[in-house]
């Protein structure tokens, strides 16, 4: 009781436990982020092998059983191919790519309430607008959920972008809110 309630300690999983879907999703996001930050040419034949090298590094401790890790790497390879195809199709219209960008928007009139958001991707398009992208490794919210504010993440990130609270990106409108 003391450890749980006073010290607020939580039970840790035993060694060798499979990571949760959330943990795997975080690792996949990390691979995409690292790839974007590396600024590699999407058209080079080395793009996929380089991304898979980053994935192997990220997944190195995924499972003590090599075969289990290899299954996840194979799944990621399929996602990496789709990611690269998507990026290549739209490369000509993108001026800047910002990965895993955190913003904070302070509202002094609301007792200094701060809205904090971390966008998977903020891509500045040639027309000056943003495309806000959220990579989903699980279910994708439906448009009706977004408009009913039951899945407000991208809408809030668009408001934050318009307010200019993401570092390195001037205030601008969003022309696309995309789940991948």
Task: State what each model feature region is.
Residues 2-9, 52-56, 123-136, 179-180:
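Active-site-adjacent bridging/hinge elements
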Residues 16-27, 47-55, 72-76, 111-115, ...:
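Secondary-structure capping and boundary motifs in well-ordered enzyme cores
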Residues 45-52, 96-98, 156-180:
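Substrate-binding beta-hairpin/strand module that engages nucleic acids
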Residues 1-34:
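C-terminal, charged and often intrinsically disordered regions of DNA end-processing helicases
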Residues 4, 29-36, 77, 81-84, ...:
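Short, well-ordered alpha-helical packing segments
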Residues 8-12, 33, 37, 138, ...:
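Short, well-ordered loop/turn and helix-capping segments at boundaries between secondary-structure elements
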Residues 98-165:
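Non-catalytic protein-protein interaction segments used by genome-maintenance enzymes to assemble
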Residues 27-108:
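A non-catalytic, helix-rich entry segment at domain boundaries
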